[in-house]
Every structure is written in structure tokens, then in C-alpha cells.
Amino acid sequence: MKKTMILIAGLVVLFTSVSAAVDDHRTARFGEETPAVVVEQQGSRISLDAYRGKWVVLSFWASTDPVSRMDQTRMASMVSDDSTACDKSGNDAEIEFRTSAGNYTLGNNTQVEVLSVNLDKSPEMMAETVRLDNLQGSTQSRVASAADAERICKAFAMEKGLRTFVIDPEGRLVMADPDEASLRLLLSRS
């Protein structure tokens, strides 16, 4: 009886510690809250939680990944583009889009924030790439450490390439790698 109780207590401790580790290192799943992301932007630390209540286009890039660099350049031009989604009367139109997590409608006053996160180990490399690619430095963020970059890559399943995600106002992941038309519609609200 005593051995059984010790065994049960040991299993409870084991499962409790395993579930805590899973919570700390959970992966992004559609329709669920995104993993924690904290980045540095112009000397300040910013948490993804600070964007609660807003739609977020979360884009990861690295200086050594030409595809993600081209995506950043394309996204920057879409954000700076003055075009908006308008209906025939010239008023801002509602945006409707479908994702694997559900169907969404963004009203006329919906704001979309863009968070571009660089995963380079070197801040100097990022700064040089921002300069070379003519990106606006104030819109670019970076991870604080190589360990953070590794954790984020794992949490967002980016082992085979960097990606862009759409997060709803409740902090749930609703879309990965949106096509250009969806991205243009979303970014017309930024």
C-alpha cells in the first residue's frame, strides 16, 4: 500500500511538471492563443500581449533568408501604399475573409497592426539589412537572444522557413502565410 501511494505521488509530480513545461513551450495552433513573443523595438521590449484588442500581422524574417526578406519588402510597400478597401460609394468597406480557424469580418474602423520580427543573432546584421532593403527601421523588431529566436521558431513551426501569421484581437492564431490578396486587404487597415 505504501509503495502504491509513493508511486501515485511520483506520477502526479511527474505529470504536473511535464504539463508546466508544455505550457511554457507550447506551439501555435489555429484557433488557439499564440505562444508568448517578446521582442525589442528601438530599445524597448514589446510583448505580443500589448496588441490585444487589435488584429496583428506577425511576420518573421532573417537577413540570411532571401524569401523572408522579399516578403518584408513587399509587405512594407503594401503598408505604405495609400490604397484602402473601399466600396462603390467611396466609404471604407468591411473586409471578409475565411481561415481554417473560422470566418472573419473586419468592420470599417478595424485597425490592423504589423509586427515584423527579425531573428538574426546580430543586431548589426539586422541594421545593415534594414538599410540595404530600404525598410523603415521603426517598424522592425528583433528577438533579444538566439535562445529566444530558437524558441519562437519551434513554437511557430518555422524549422523549414520563416512565416507570416495573422492573429485576431483575442490573441488567437487564425491564419498562416496569407496570400497576397488577403494580406493586401488586411494591411489596408494598418
Could you describe each region identified by the protein language model?
Residues 20-48, 70, 80, 188:
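N-terminal "domain-start" segment that seeds a small globular fold
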Residues 27, 48-49, 58, 66-71, ...:
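Extended hydrophobic-aromatic, low-complexity segments
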Residues 54-56, 112, 162:
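Alpha/beta-hydrolase fold active-site loops
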Residues 160-190:
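Thiol-/selenol-based redox modules, centered on thioredoxin-like
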